[in-house]
């Protein structure tokens, strides 16, 4: 189990928190190898950039190293593959999604002295590059490209509708616990999609250590238990959701599901 609180996550680099999360979900996560690989990449970056004195040129060289020489890229073919959210597998495959690639860039960038911050934009994870005395530059970790205000506005409209307006709060830096919470939700969704229910159950159990009475997490846990043929526990979780969210559209559907599962249990017992 993940014995870390919000303060622990804030005290470490995002990629370190993600690795701890990955290990708690899947014990086969190659934690030690990942730390060794991160140290190797950092050493290689330090050597590659040692003669570059101009900070902006140094950062551009860092991006070229990351995306071109090391070959990291966004996984366009299987974006929702759970491997894109396990850091050890991102390091092995050189493929990921914005939050996993962004966490690597943040880790290496901070060690190299670059002023980078993570931003949980409504559509995806972004990085802001904050040179002293200048307006922030926003980077898409999926491909390393600069994102204009116009593009950010277009993304927001596509996500929230034609009346959406880009506001300063959309581009504020976010703390590690918030990102880790969203990372956990992303992993759970990917594992459910892949029907890897035992690992998905670990995600839900972890989420419930942070929000113990969240009816939506308990509903999701019920669904997972149902897939694992643990019908009595599934019924209990569904009933909890129905009692606490009676006006949710899912409540009526779950009542039908509870009746069906109860009937199946009675038939099995007889």
Swiss-Prot record:
Family, similarity comment: Belongs to the UPF0162 family.
Question: What is the name of the protein in this document?
Answer: UPF0162 protein VC_2176
At the top level, the lineage of the source is: Bacteria
Instruction: Note the InterPro entries from the entry.
Output: SirB1_N, TPR-like_helical_dom_sf
SUPFAM superfamilies attached to this UniProt entry: TPR-like (SSF48452)
Which Gene3D superfamilies does the protein's record reference?
Tetratricopeptide repeat domain
């Amino acid at each position: 189990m993940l014995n870390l609180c919000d303060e622990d996550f804030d005290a470490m680099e995002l990629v370190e928190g993600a690795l701890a999360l990955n290990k708690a979900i899947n014990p086969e996560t190659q934690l030690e190898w990942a730390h060794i690989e991160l140290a190797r990449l950092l050493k290689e970056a330090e050597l590659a950039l040692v003669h570059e004195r101009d900070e902006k040129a140094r950062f551009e060289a860092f991006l070229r190293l990351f995306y071109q020489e090391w070959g990291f890229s966004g996984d366009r073919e299987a974006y929702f593959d759970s491997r894109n959210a396990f850091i050890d597998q991102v390091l092995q495959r050189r493929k990921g999604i914005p939050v996993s690639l962004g966490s690597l860039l943040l880790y290496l960038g901070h060690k190299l002295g670059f002023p980078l911050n993570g931003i949980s934009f409504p559509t995806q994870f972004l990085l802001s590059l904050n040179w002293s005395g200048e307006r922030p530059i926003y980077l898409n970790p999926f491909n390393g490209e600069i994102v204009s205000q116009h593009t950010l506005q277009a993304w927001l409209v596509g996500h929230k509708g034609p009346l959406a307006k880009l506001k300063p709060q959309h581009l504020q830096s976010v703390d590690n616990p918030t990102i880790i919470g969203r990372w956990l939700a992303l992993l759970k969704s990917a594992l459910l999609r892949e029907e890897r229910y035992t690992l998905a159950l670990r995600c839900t159990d972890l989420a419930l250590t942070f929000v113990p009475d969240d009816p939506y997490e308990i509903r999701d846990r019920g669904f997972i238990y149902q897939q694992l043929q643990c019908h009595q526990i599934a019924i209990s979780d569904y009933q909890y959701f129905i009692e606490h969210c009676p006006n949710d559209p899912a409540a009526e559907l779950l009542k039908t599901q509870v009746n069906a599962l109860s009937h199946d249990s009675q038939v099995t017992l007889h």
